[in-house]
């Protein structure tokens, strides 16, 4: 027999849905039978399949262990690396500095050692996450970053935080800032690039157009050049729209591709500066700027967080021209 106390993440769901998640190997036919014969009870009493569970309810299941989730020792996330760069953490969210080379979610090449796998392991070992107890929610990422790009990723610890942050992302109340190194220098020190983008799903590439064409979506990329050295420009970028490969494709369209970008840039140009196999792009800063109610996350309003280390700052200023780690990142001048 196993007992479960209904927590915040399981509140208001149907009894049968909860049982499916608590005992995923229990056949549907037995589920109905066990509820009917009182082998599954809510607060010590027989309940209907459609019963909506409330916070604090106790669900008792007098069923064999074979119907429950696999044992702790076989959880895949326990095989993930323990290494996490945590920028900020509280009871609702985590902000992680994802390093280049780490996947956010599993793919065909890497199933276990991913950012979400590491987060699950970390919270499990802290006692904040248990697959047996939190049956309707697991730690979830609010945003994702490509494997070859590093930077800040937001993780939600509970369903309410995930709901709020997903809405805030949609409403553009989370501002994400990137650092990148461009080959060349934009015509203006700062500005907003406005164009249109079409994604080729099969090739996983995008194309940029000056004017709207069928199936295209508007893109807006705000930028400011911080410094230019030896034909390379360290640039801060804010995405005003969030499209696939937007930063990489947009700057390449204007003749200033990202250093190291083999997909939208020029390998010949890249080789002039070294044998880099990844683009110089990092999501280094995040600002919460709520214009509507943020519920349990209201305390985050107007707060800004930065990643501690951007790997290519030192590369950009290589040779001791500028001490990049202590340099104040502000533009010399601004043009409109």
Segments and roles (model prediction):
Residues 1-201, 306, 311-317, 328-332, ...:
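RNA pseudouridine synthases
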Residues 147-149, 173-177, 192, 216-220, ...:
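Short gly/pro-enriched beta-turn/loop segments at secondary-structure junctions
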Residues 204-214:
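Short aromatic-glycine motifs in intrinsically disordered, low-complexity regions
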Residues 223:
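Long C-terminal interaction/binding lobes of large macromolecular proteins
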